[in-house]
Amino acid sequence: MFRILFFILAFTTHAFAQDTSMTAERLAQIIMDIDPDAAITPSGIELTIEDIPVLVVMAPAADRMRAMVPIASVEDVTPEEMSRMMQANFDTALDARYAVAQDRVWGVFIHPLGALEREQFLSAIAQTVNLARTYGTLYSGGAQVFGGGDSNDIYQGLVDDLLNRGQDI
């Protein structure tokens, strides 16, 4: 009797669970809540956060998404700056990373699309923007700062601002 009940519950519970997977449509709505002037382009969705351009690219068939912020031309990067970016990728860039592609330095966050949560995405956008803002100085995603400086408050202010734009979708 208990085996039958367990079998029924095991195979029907999933059918009643609400699907909370991130979709391209849901992510696009979150982006529009962040920046109502965001534009859908052939390459993705372009938005602006604090005067910094952000490009979000999605590949639903591959279950991937990428948020990218252009930072600098590779030609202008010194070996010392490149080394500093690699160090930052290890300890201060956090979930976002410095990357090089198409002769540019980028702040990039890459994640499986379906597993992405709203707050995680908003934190990722804040981190990629902070990589651009702190390039050449702190090289920090800003989410975790050790010590009593001002950086954590600046980062938290950006995350709070993004969280307050729009409703949960």
Map each language-model feature to its residues.
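Sec-dependent N-terminal signal peptides
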Residues: 4-13
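N-terminal secretory signal peptides
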Residues: 18-65, 71-75, 79-80, 88, ...
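Sec/Tat-exported extracytoplasmic proteins
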Residues: 31-38, 89, 132-139, 143
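Short glycine-rich, low-complexity/disordered patches
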Residues: 40-46, 95-103, 137-155
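Short, internal acidic amphipathic alpha-helical interface segments
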Residues: 68-110
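A short, solvent-exposed beta-edge/loop patch
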Residues: 96-137
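C-terminal partner/receptor-binding element of secreted or periplasmic proteins
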Residues: 124-169
